[in-house]
Amino acid sequence: ITPDCPFIDPEIVDNVIEYFLKHSDKFDYVSNCHPPSYPDGLDLEIMHLFTLETAWKNSVDPIEREHTTTHIWKRPEIFRIGNVCMSEEKNLFMTERWTLDYPEDFEFTKQIYENLYHNGNIFLMDEILQFLSKRPEIKKINSHLCEYNSVH
């Protein structure tokens, strides 16, 4: 989970953690972003400590030094990689941008929080999707940036 992801959904986190724990003997690394299917900004990665240590020790590329897990998922011949997808028929990665990199992303984030966050409540992915379906003008604030959605 990275700091530019202000809408992390605890149910998605629980699902990916449960999958990793259930299959920890089969995978060194599990994410929900290789391949991506959730909205950009709901991505998370889980790995064994030895996997992270191996990546840290062997990463020489500057990108891999900044984004250590890149070393892992670019080497499926070395690391056993698992992924949790939304569903076979649903992929929101290139149509939903819920990350915080540009001023438009900040305005989008501000609008979501002003409309959905009240008295410390937690709101989830489905609530954001429902809200955006009723308020498409908010989705348009940063939709032109979806082409920049990426996984590090």
Show which residues each predicted segment covers.
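Conserved alpha/beta core of the MobA/IspD/sugar-nucleotide pyrophosphorylase nucleotidyltransferase superfamily
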Residues: 69-152
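Short helix-to-loop capping/linker segments positioned immediately adjacent to catalytic or ligand/cofactor-binding
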Residues: 37, 54-62, 119
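A recurrent flexible, glycine/aromatic-enriched loop bordering the glycosyltransferase active site
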Residues: 32-43, 91-92
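Active-site acidic Asp-centered loop
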Residues: 1-3
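Conserved donor-nucleotide/metal-binding helix-loop-beta segment in metal-dependent transferases, i.e.
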Residues: 5-37
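A conserved catalytic-core signature of glycosyltransferases
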Residues: 41-42, 47, 67, 95-96
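Conserved nucleotide-sugar donor-binding
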Residues: 44-56, 103-107
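Active-site cores that bind ATP or allylic diphosphates and position pyrophosphate for catalysis
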Residues: 61, 65, 74
